Amino acid sequence: MSENTQPEQNQPLTGAPSPEELEAAQAANEFDALTQAQAELVTLQAKNTELADSYLRAKAETENARRRADDEIAKARKFALESFAESLLPVVDSLEAGLAHKDATPEQIREGADATLKQLKTTLERNKIVEINPASGSRFDPHQHQAISMVPAEQEANTVVSVLQKGYLISDRVLRPALVTVTAPK
């Protein structure tokens, strides 16, 4: 018989990998997985750095916007106060002109005071400051009136009898409530 007919013991079976080949293939797979994981890590670290930078920029933009808004509010308040003060200057001028007339009669003083009061009220209205002056017999409004006293009367309870001091609204907000006397419950 020839030597080729007997299978050799050192020769591996065809189709089945040897343990060394399995180990090498497993090591190659692990190396590929490690390489892929390292590449993903580098990508994720770059993305993290990019997101952290974007966050810091957005935070800085927000702080700058807040600072600009605060500055704008401060400027608006300052301008509103300046505008209001400027609108009062003609009233001051009228008072000073009236006081400069040393020989004015009581009637002239009264006319000057009436004109100056009218000028002041016009200025207040132009600046959205409106009187609260409830009519006698009107219903008591706790949002705009402050009851100072109660008096017995024939009218319905909580009805305004008299106004002791006018109140004022500024842009639909109570600056000072009107001080009123109201009817007591029967």
Curated annotation (Swiss-Prot):
GO biological process: protein folding
Intracellular or extracellular location(s): Cytoplasm
Keywords, comma-separated and alphabetical: Chaperone, Cytoplasm, Stress response
SUPFAM superfamilies registered for this protein in UniProt: Coiled-coil domain of nucleotide exchange factor GrpE, Head domain of nucleotide exchange factor GrpE
GO molecular function, one term: protein-folding chaperone binding
InterPro entries (UniProt xref): GrpE, GrpE_coiled_coil, GrpE_head
Any one GO CC term of the record: cytosol
Keyword flag Isomerase: no
Location, primary (coarse class): cytoplasm
Residue ranges of the region described as Disordered: 1-22
A Pfam match: GrpE
Feature: compositional bias, Polar residues: 1-13
Keyword match Transmembrane helix: no
Summary of subunit composition and partner proteins: Homodimer.
UniProt record similarity statement: Belongs to the GrpE family.
NCBIfam families with a match to the protein in the record: PRK14139.1 (NF010737), PRK14140.1 (NF010738), PRK14150.1 (NF010748)
UniProt xrefs under PANTHER family: GRPE PROTEIN (PTHR21237), GRPE PROTEIN HOMOLOG, MITOCHONDRIAL (PTHR21237:SF23)
Role: Participates actively in the response to hyperosmotic and heat shock by preventing the aggregation of stress-denatured proteins, in association with DnaK and GrpE. It is the nucleotide exchange factor for DnaK and may function as a thermosensor. Unfolded proteins bind initially to DnaJ; upon interaction with the DnaJ-bound protein, DnaK hydrolyzes its bound ATP, resulting in the formation of a stable complex. GrpE releases ADP from DnaK; ATP binding to DnaK triggers the release of the substrate protein, thus completing the reaction cycle.
Record-given protein name: Protein GrpE
Gene designation per UniProt: grpE
